[in-house]
């Protein structure tokens, strides 16, 4: 694989003014091998990290919005010279798949970054450890055309992430990295999507949505997931009491508010309705407006898909001890179900940690090295 030193661009279907055009791309647009790239070098812990940056790659043939249906791929330079990078080669390197979704809003494709304190973000740190990085963007609940049509409501975000995975499987022979070793990562709503990506594998519920956007005809299962403070299992946090040692943040009906005005109500809207309830309790005891389609509600909850003999073997779940955005019981329930079905679960409630993610990158990538090399 080769290319000129340039930034890979993509013509938007929806531009900065969210104007919609009709775009059809043929299946050849999903081939990675002819993509252009830019060679970059950044420092991590005083050492040079050199990699090739392939950016703004559409991962579907019929995108609704190329800004949010594209991804950035970063590959250590060593793999183009038949050299090892840390423990890995071009054939064995796992693929780190971080999403940047927060609050179920649209998430742009992540880039390698150094914070003000000089510490690397997860993308750059992954490269420093020899991983290939595929960072997909994804649509979210606030995407809207100038005509007032919403195009990022549930299940758009998880469909987009699954399409990105399908792209990687399709191009497994065309690019460095092992698509059989994809590790997803996300925080908060992005953490919930990471869980969902692992739980759903090749579930047929998503097939019509993938076909509609022109996803590659390939597998959508992944090897492992990492999740921080996942905002998940939204319908089951309607208890009357909350963890008093942490303090209550949300009233009962934590995510499906009776006034139909939370971000999660916004998530379950439609193309023409901005907000909808997703529990009968909130609708009946609140404003009486409609409840979202049951099948779509199902598609956004990993507990509906976690079952024995799934394709994702390894699960790393973190929920901070002073995080009151949801109950730590939610992640405990998810971890317990996974463990009961025999999956490899690495679960922790780190002391003194609030609603946050990527705070233990060295531990995270030590875990990745361990599960990949077992």
Predicted regions mapped to residue ranges:
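Short beta-strand element of the alpha/beta-hydrolase
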Residues: 71, 86-104
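Primarily recognizes the serine-hydrolase "nucleophile elbow" in alpha/beta-hydrolase
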Residues: 170-247, 297
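Alpha/beta-hydrolase active-site loop
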Residues: 150-174, 360
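Sec-dependent signal peptide cleavage junction
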Residues: 2-18
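Catalytic-loop region of hydrolases
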Residues: 13-87
